[in-house]
Amino acid sequence: MTEIYDFDKSAWDIKGSIAPIQPTTYSDGRLVPQVRVIDPGLGDRKDECFMYMFLLGVVEDSDPLGPPIGRAFGSLPLGVGRSTAKPEKLLKEATELDIVVRRTAGLNEKLVFYNNTPLTLLTPWRKVLTTGSVFNANQVCSAVNLIPLDTPQRFRVVYMSITRLSDNGYYTVPRRMLEFRSVNAVAFNLLVTLRIDKAIGPGKIIDNTEQLPEATFMVHIGNFRRKKSEVYSADYCKMKIEKMGLVFALGGIGGTSLHIRSTGKMSKTLHAQLGFKKTLCYPLMDINEDLNRLLWRSRCKIVRIQAVLQPSVPQEFRIYDDVIINDDQGLFKVL
């Protein structure tokens, strides 16, 4: 049985939206570089220099003899760095990077990025830029099927998204608990509804996604479980949720991310499940990569957040992350 509880909009009305990146072009049709700064926190961190950087741009042919052919729109998550430089100067250096892109495959299709340009202001992000990085292609590229193998490719940075990490403490991405199941437990999930205003202008390139007025995604927070064999009632779980004093915001981790902060009292069991942290981050890059790509340059705002209380999936139910399901005869083996 599923029970749904609506949060009051005051829980996200301050930081629950992201401004769009409106594409503008030069006279020759090239996109004008832009930077967007997002601050989803409450501003209680003493040192305000920590930030997460996310680059957006065009994957194009690296041909010095003619105008480059744009293949797809792509992104490069650089991660967290510490810098006092102005966003505009960081953007300028990013647009001067010579980032090579290569298409390859592992468990799934991958994109390999590595930079050949010396770093100055972007030195805090040298781990990704100088040693190279490999990403799931569908997470960082709008149309990986259009990227050729016989023509050298480069990633030309056009947009930069900076997320200031102004909350005190650590940001937890509770990956270990997302598949946790327990007997006689109630799963606490969130259903988030976003209103989307897609940024489309004269600089529009390959993009197969369609404009959606609203979109939803779901995240798992944790489980409410009693020590005995009984199960908590939905009303009791709702009371525990209300006591948590949850505040929501949108950030730019991995593209678009949901940030949650508990300002109230959290149950000891749930607090332990979340690594004893009260500041959580759920990147859409991991949760819903298709929606995340749609939101790369879009204006979006939270219009509804609902707590969804469901019975925890029984432990005997197997989770199949692969399309191959072994039969009892062992006729199909996975190496």
Curated annotation (Swiss-Prot):
GO biological process, one term: virion assembly
GO cellular component terms attached to this protein's record: host cell plasma membrane; membrane; viral envelope; viral nucleocapsid
InterPro entries tied to this protein: Matrix_C, Matrix_N, Matrix_Paramyxo_C, Matrix_Paramyxo_N
S-S pairs: none
Chief location bin: virion
Signal sequence coordinates: none
UniProt keywords, alphabetically: Host cell membrane, Host membrane, Host-virus interaction, Lipid-binding, Membrane, Viral envelope protein, Viral matrix protein, Virion
One annotated GO molecular function: structural constituent of virion
Domain of life: Viruses
Localisation: Virion; Host cell membrane
Family recorded in the similarity comment: Belongs to the morbillivirus/respirovirus/rubulavirus M protein family.
Stated role: The M protein has a crucial role in virus assembly and interacts with the RNP complex as well as with the viral membrane. Associates with phosphatidylserine (PS) and phosphatidylinositol 4,5-bisphosphate (PIP2) at the plasma membrane. Interaction with PIP2 triggers matrix protein lattice polymerization. Matrix proteins induce host membrane deformation and curvature necessary for virion assembly/budding.
Subunit structure of this chain's protein: Homodimer. Dimerization is critical for virion formation. Interacts with host ANP32B.
Name the record gives this protein: Matrix protein
Name of the encoding gene: M
